[in-house]
């Protein structure tokens, strides 16, 4: 899958779950499960409930995503 196929949307982290998984409420009020992208894990970027994040979704599974950026 190429990077052109992903859907990027912003949201707020609601809850931290085990194994670097988070519940994120998107701007359109949907709640999805997200995991942290590898580069964020590599650079030890911490994500806490209440943080504003950018999420990538694939067209195949719109209920799971990947957190790619944490806004400051």
From Swiss-Prot:
Record keywords: Protein biosynthesis included?
Answer: yes
What disulfide bonds does the UniProt entry report for this chain?
none
* Principal subcellular localisation of the protein: cytoplasm
**Entry's Gene Ontology molecular function annotations:** ribosome binding; rRNA binding; translation initiation factor activity
Under InterPro entries, the record lists:
NA-bd_OB-fold, RNA-binding_domain_S1_IF1, TIF_IF1
Please indicate if the UniProt record lists RNA-binding as a keyword. yes
Query: Which CDD domains does the record cross-reference, listed alphabetically?
Result: S1_IF1 (cd04451)
One cellular-component annotation, GO: cytosol
How it assembles, according to the record, is: Component of the 30S ribosomal translation pre-initiation complex which assembles on the 30S ribosome in the order IF-2 and IF-3, IF-1 and N-formylmethionyl-tRNA(fMet); mRNA recruitment can occur at any time during PIC assembly.
Q: What does this chain do?
A: One of the essential components for the initiation of protein synthesis. Stabilizes the binding of IF-2 and IF-3 on the 30S subunit to which N-formylmethionyl-tRNA(fMet) subsequently binds. Helps modulate mRNA selection, yielding the 30S pre-initiation complex (PIC). Upon addition of the 50S ribosomal subunit IF-1, IF-2 and IF-3 are released leaving the mature 70S translation initiation complex.
Per its record, how is this protein called by name? Translation initiation factor IF-1
Give the gene symbol.
Answer: infA
